[in-house]
Swiss-Prot record:
Keywords: Acyltransferase, Amino-acid biosynthesis, Arginine biosynthesis, Autocatalytic cleavage, Mitochondrion, Multifunctional enzyme, Transferase, Transit peptide. The active site is at T247. Substrate binds at T207, K236, T247, E334, N474, T479. CDD domains: OAT. It comes from the Eukaryota. This is Arginine biosynthesis bifunctional protein ArgJ, mitochondrial.
Length: 479
């Protein structure tokens, strides 16, 4: 069953893989060779893969059907289909106005207890959110049409449906459902397992994204060290990004064998440490869905017990993978020029560290200062000080320190040490802020535990800056 309670974890996590437990190959993040999609900004092309290691038994397609009138070129209908029934798990937005596809996909997974899922269909250009009973029927029609193409009974009943539905785009408008339904057979006929097909499918779920977000990895598990498994995922999101998730769609596929209850637990764990640890603008959307499908085609013993070495290994793999996907979303934040990691150290608890990091990440004053390359650490400290919901004694001003950590590995630039301001080298600060990547470190010194609390808990958040372009993009969004 899909939990109805918020799944945002209160602490961060950096996976540590035991030697021999998992061998994860590097993510396929490489520079484009040829051809180069001219629509992708040159600065973003390094994040688009030129090849991939995709899971067995999955085929995908991206098709243009014209959901949004202004889109006359790019694919806007994605289909991801497995040759075999899958275990499936999903996590959804906690926004009270949950879009029709969110409601329908929840019902499908619940009715099937996460078993027997065959496909995902997703459209961009229209969110199908706040569209009443008609919107619910449209989402069900999309699911049923894919089931029909697969050759399954398509009754429209939740228990019979095997296709999850996702939508993203403008809220409050009905889908051009005739275009979508008529385009589904074409998309199904074009299903392919090639890298080009995966990339085109990732492009089909984009809205204001400037590049398709696609990753793939290969790995092994302790019980089958000679057997290679694969995981691939695509995500979209550039604005309205803040936990509990936001305008985020994510589709992850693996050929590893994982039982549905274990898969749901694995996904919830990984999302709390990845997609729920990012922020672009602090807004939470109506449509967020992250789904993972496991078809087991690569063989091996199914993962079921949380106590097993395979479960532990898969947890590390999935968490690392979703973190990489989530960070691509931040790198494509609307109008963003900076990718910022904020790390809160030596907190009495994970939850307090995460709350403080989250508060810094969504501060407009911090984000605009970073855009202006201004080492205004007072704004960071201010955000730390007004963080709501933390335990008493977490923040002791005279034990708090702030610094910038450069990407080149050089020593941290200390801005505040134990509550005392440092004489900041403005020239070095300016040089650090010229870089695209930056880490802000806030050390709480153990809070009211003092020296005894040092070496305590960390919290991590990833976010971007605010630029003039962010306002322009969102001011013109519906046009």
């Amino acid at each position: 069953m899909v939990p109805n309670t918020p799944f945002l974890a209160a602490f961060s996590y950096t996976p540590r893989v035991r030697p021999g437990a998992v061998r994860a190959l590097a993510a396929q993040v490489r520079h484009y060779t040829t051809p180069i999609d001219p629509s992708i900004p040159e600065s973003k092309r390094k994040f688009v893969p030129c090849s991939g290691a995709y899971p067995l038994g999955f085929r995908v397609s991206g098709t243009h059907v014209g959901v949004k009138k202004s889109n006359i070129t790019f694919p806007d209908l994605a289909i991801i289909c497995s040759e075999e029934p899958c275990s499936a798990a999903a996590v959804f937005t906690t926004n009270k106005f949950q879009a029709a596809p969110v409601q329908v996909s929840k019902q499908i997974i619940n009715a099937r207890s996460g078993r027997g899922i065959r496909a995902v269909i997703a459209n961009s250009g229209c969110a199908n959110a706040v569209t009443g009973k008609g919107g619910i029927q449209d989402a069900k029609s999309m699911s049923a049409k894919v089931d029909q193409c697969i050759g399954l009974k398509a009754t429209g009943n939740d228990g019979d449906s095997s296709t999850l539905v996702m939508s993203t785009g403008v809220i409050g408008q009905r889908l051009p459902i005739e275009k979508i339904i008529s385009g589904i057979p074409t998309g199904y006929a074009n299903l392919s397992s090639t890298h080009t097909a995966w990339l085109k499918t990732a492009r089909a779920i984009c809205t204001t994204d400037t590049f398709p977000k696609l990753l793939s990895r290969s790995f092994t598990l302790p019980s089958s060290p000679d057997r290679t498994y694969h995981i691939a995922g695509m995500t979209k999101g550039a604005g309205m990004i803040h936990p509990n998730m936001a305008t985020l769609l994510g589709i992850i596929c693996t050929d590893a064998p994982i039982e549905a209850p274990a898969l749901q637990s694995l996904l919830a764990h990984s999302v709390s440490r990845s997609f729920n640890s990012i922020s672009v603008d602090g807004d939470t959307s109506t449509n967020d869905t992250i789904a993972v499908l496991a078809n087991g085609v690569a063989g091996g013993k199914p993962i079921s017990s949380p106590e097993s070495p395979e479960y532990t290994a898969m947890q590390s793999i999935l968490t690392s993978f979703t973190q990489s996907l989530a960070q691509l979303v931040v790198r494509d934040g609307e109008g963003a020029t900076k990718f910022v990691t904020v790390r809160v150290r030596n907190s009495p608890s994970h939850s307090d560290a995460k709350l403080i990091a989250s508060t810094i990440a969504r501060s407009p004053l911090v984000k605009t200062a970073l855009y202006g390359k201004d080492a205004n650490w007072g704004r960071i400290l201010c955000a730390v000080g007004y963080t709501q919901g933390i335990s008493p004694g977490t923040i002791i001003p005279e034990r708090t320190s702030v610094s910038f950590k450069p990407v080149d590995g050089s020593p941290e630039l200390k801005l505040l040490v134990n509550g005392e301001p440092e004489a900041v080298d403005e020239e070095r600060a300016s040089a650090i802020l010229q870089n695209e990547d930056l880490e802000i470190v806030v050390d709480l010194g153990g809070g009211d535990k003092g020296e005894a609390g040092k070496g305590g808990e960390d919290g991590v958040f990833w976010f971007c800056d605010f630029s003039h372009e962010y306002v322009t993009i969102n001011g013109d969004y519906r046009t």
